[in-house]
Amino acid sequence: MDVIKISPRGYCYGVVDAMVIAKNASLDKSLPRPIYILGMIVHNKHVTDAFEEEGIFTLDGSNRLDILKQVDKGTVIFTAHGVSPEVRRIAEEKGLVAIDATCPDVTKTHNLILEMKEKGYHVIYIGKKGHPEPEGAVGVAPEIVHLVETEEDVKNLDIQSEKLIVTNQTTMSQWDVHDIMELVKEKYPHVEYHQEICLATQVRQEAVSEQAKKADLTIVVGDPKSNNSNRLAQVSEEIAGTKAYRIGDLSELKLEWLKGVNTVAVTAGASTPTPITKEVIRFLEQFDHEDPSTWTTEHNIPLKKILPKVKAKN
């Protein structure tokens, strides 16, 4: 089968940095144990499973404050998605060692919100409800940040302020953000724009929007909780016009999707381990509709191959 390996795809620098920070923590014998990650360090189950083998445990829950209630001692790692100042304060009050793996692009948004608060602004924040990144951003200044996800959310806004700015979650579809921003502009003509789609997300979406047009089908390799992975599938269908499926790894690929398909495009979310994506590509390249011996969708990547290699500190 012909395979279009969409480029760029896969890991972004924020994800790699977060994983290296957590991996270094696992090797640092001076850190108090146990070591916990507040939520998924990045949204990929293969990564969290690999860290568990390294002795770092992922705690999950509805929000970061609830997760933090589960921890009474040891070390906590804040994920790439960022956390609110309240989470940081409570971790300190509990006497926990805190390690910050927040993506620099997310930190930039937090700093923008703080700056706008000091200037007397209200902030309309476009993001996915229930996702940890908006949770942290809203938590920076909950009294002035208004989270919107849908057209209905914009209609329900009631902000009485001449100082108003609109920004967004870094991993949203740039087309979705544009549409919501236009609705906000209609309602509040005086609003200022500050689009925060991170460059890695933007170039991956643009690559899919162009390169997937040449394919009969797009496979996005990414975790179901990965917002940027889900958005890549959306971009393939809505912008490139190519049917797309998201899979966590090769074992989730269904052969019936490949019926009548001659060319398939493959991309991966920013939190998807490269070996997982390569395994999918290898399978598709050798796949033959007429040869059942090429039809086995068995995932065989060991967890020890998932995490980046770092040197132990002396």
Swiss-Prot record:
GO terms for molecular function: 4 iron, 4 sulfur cluster binding; 4-hydroxy-3-methylbut-2-enyl diphosphate reductase activity; metal ion binding. It comes from the Bacteria. Isopentenyl diphosphate binds at H43, H81, H131, S226, N228, S271. Its cofactor is [4Fe-4S] cluster. Pathway: Isoprenoid biosynthesis; dimethylallyl diphosphate biosynthesis; dimethylallyl diphosphate from (2E)-4-hydroxy-3-methylbutenyl diphosphate: step 1/1; Isoprenoid biosynthesis; isopentenyl diphosphate biosynthesis via DXP pathway; isopentenyl diphosphate from 1-deoxy-D-xylulose 5-phosphate: step 6/6. The keyword rRNA-binding does not apply. (2E)-4-hydroxy-3-methylbut-2-enyl diphosphate binds at H43, H81, H131, T170, S226, N228, S271. Its EC number is 1.17.7.4. One of its GO terms (cellular component) is cytosol. Dimethylallyl diphosphate binds at H43, H81, H131, S226, N228, S271. Coiled coil: none annotated. The active site is at E133. It catalyses: isopentenyl diphosphate + 2 oxidized [2Fe-2S]-[ferredoxin] + H2O = (2E)-4-hydroxy-3-methylbut-2-enyl diphosphate + 2 reduced [2Fe-2S]-[ferredoxin] + 2 H(+); dimethylallyl diphosphate + 2 oxidized [2Fe-2S]-[ferredoxin] + H2O = (2E)-4-hydroxy-3-methylbut-2-enyl diphosphate + 2 reduced [2Fe-2S]-[ferredoxin] + 2 H(+). Pfam families: LYTB. Binds 1 [4Fe-4S] cluster per subunit. Signal peptide: none annotated. Keywords: 4Fe-4S, Iron, Iron-sulfur, Isoprene biosynthesis, Metal-binding, Oxidoreductase. GO terms for biological process: dimethylallyl diphosphate biosynthetic process; isopentenyl diphosphate biosynthetic process, methylerythritol 4-phosphate pathway; terpenoid biosynthetic process. Belongs to the IspH family. NCBIfam families: ispH_lytB, PRK01045.1-1. Catalyzes the conversion of 1-hydroxy-2-methyl-2-(E)-butenyl 4-diphosphate (HMBPP) into a mixture of isopentenyl diphosphate (IPP) and dimethylallyl diphosphate (DMAPP). Acts in the terminal step of the DOXP/MEP pathway for isoprenoid precursor biosynthesis. This is 4-hydroxy-3-methylbut-2-enyl diphosphate reductase. It comes from Bacillus subtilis (strain 168). The lineage of its organism: Bacteria, Bacillati, Bacillota, Bacilli, Bacillales. The gene is ispH.
